[in-house]
Amino acid sequence: MAGLDLLQSCPAQIAAKAHPEVSPRVRGPFKGQPLETFALGPLMDVLNRVEFEGDSIQQALETVAQHRRPPSHPGLGTFTEHAVRGYLANPSNPLSCDEPMYPVRGFWVCRGKKDGVVRETWAWGRRYRSQDGAVRELRVFRFGTAGSRTRPPAELATAAYTTAFGSPAAWPDPWREPFDPVPPSGPAVRRVRIVEFGCLDSSRAVLFDGTVEEAAAMYAAGAQDVLRQRALGGAPNPGSDCADCKIITACDALPRVPGLLGIADSSKVRRTLSAATAKAYASCPAQEHLSRTLHLPRPLDSEYSPKAIRGQAVHAVLEANHARMPRVPCQIGDFPDGSQDWSVGRWQVRGDQALVAARMLAHHVAVCPFRHANQVIDSRVEPVIVAHDTAADVLVVAKPDLIYRDSEGWVWRETKTTQWYGPKTMTLLEEHPQLAFAVLLLRAGVLGPGSAGARIEVEVLRPDGADPSCLDPADPETAAEAQRIVTGLAEPWHADMRSIARPGESCRTCPVSQWCPDYVPPRTNSDHIFDADGVDEELLDDPQNDDAW
């Protein structure tokens, strides 16, 4: 929502974005996106044509689909039409609380100059004003349901402040140039509203409704210092945002591992690959693009199976325990006993699965990585590990459950839950490709000092026991198998620029089937659920599926 993205995790990247004139010393060849990657871009274009050009909804949809570049995936086209029709369901006043509001072109920009430096603050969204201009409204978007999550206070305060005090300005062309605000005319702004629209269900929520004085006070208390600090930057923190960073070639904190994926082709546009992305692509290219690149929302009536909820709940409990400081080993008393339903965060574990999950957690005690906490030098819960394969121009991202360091080196820890007791038809790396990615990343030394003696621990929890395993990334056979698996998953994904749907069995568990024109419905409604033992946890619990803008 704010012009300065407050949600990104890398201070250096945020600062670089806050300075449009900053550019890399060495520019690589231009690589155009084959498909639209900003899901709300077509939506904004269609609304612009309806509100400012007088097009009908259908005319606007057809014009944008025909002329916007890069083109949208068919699934994004479905989502765009759904969101547009919901947004414009009441054309005269779709979201406002009382009086009619009228669309405003351009942006509301607060601009100042100090020590020769131009400072600009603005917020992204759709802008509206009352007939006399005394009331302004900024409408922002959430992919899912409006009001379902709280936005950062600094973000909301910035939106309210720029809506209250910003001057109209067109988008700079080129972007490195400053805005050229025009002093507003007419009555002074007296009232400001920030309204959130939910694209999935056409819901709306008023996030702020107050005077300009209240907006100024909120900005001074909760945003001014935050924005100043973000613009100053800080130490780089490589993560999932690296692919879009304009100073990536100058970043010393990002590990570079040419050949990590076994692909010698850097001609494609830079993208990000994780084990979950690779698995989603192998299931269906369209599913991967719609869910993990565009982050389109899941239907409201989609549901997780009890097994999936159980697995997520077990992981959430262990994550909280392993984050405690000082480090202490897990004890039976830390866990629910399973005699009744229980919950952790968003996960409600009920019935038989409440007892199954409790038994799994109880068996974790015997294999807890902090049994000898005094020997642990460092630990990080669910860190984001990233490396740049420059030979393929791909950011490889992983998120282990836990990494910790002892006297031997770094340990990459993964926990799995299952009730499966049947025969094994796959190796551990084949069954869990994220372990294959872990092998290659550890062999490349991406964790820094302590990587030489690194190992991977896998903890499989069942109701009747824990099954620990250990993998040595330095073992030649293990490394060869990991490379075969990773390259086999990465090659087709890397080569594919169209993400054509592959309807079939994958439709049954597809989280974005609502948007896919090629979706094949299951035989019964109960068939369309998310099962745990066959679906990666990272794919299930992807918070970006309800992203806010």
Residue ranges and their predicted role:
Residues 1-8, 238-313, 319, 548-549:
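C-terminal, charged and often intrinsically disordered regions of DNA end-processing helicases
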Residues 2-66, 73-74, 160-165, 183, ...:
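Polyanion-engaging groove/track-forming segments
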Residues 10-20, 52-59, 127-138, 185-201, ...:
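Short, compositionally biased low-complexity segments
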Residues 24-109, 310-390:
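A non-catalytic, helix-rich entry segment at domain boundaries
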Residues 36, 40-58, 62-65, 134-136, ...:
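Long, contiguous, compositionally biased segments that the model treats as domain-scale units
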Residues 97-171, 382-446:
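Non-catalytic protein-protein interaction segments used by genome-maintenance enzymes to assemble
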Residues 148-150, 162-263, 443-549:
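Metal-dependent nuclease catalytic regions and adjoining charged, substrate-binding loops involved
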Residues 283-517, 521-527:
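A broadly structural signal marking compact, well-ordered functional cores
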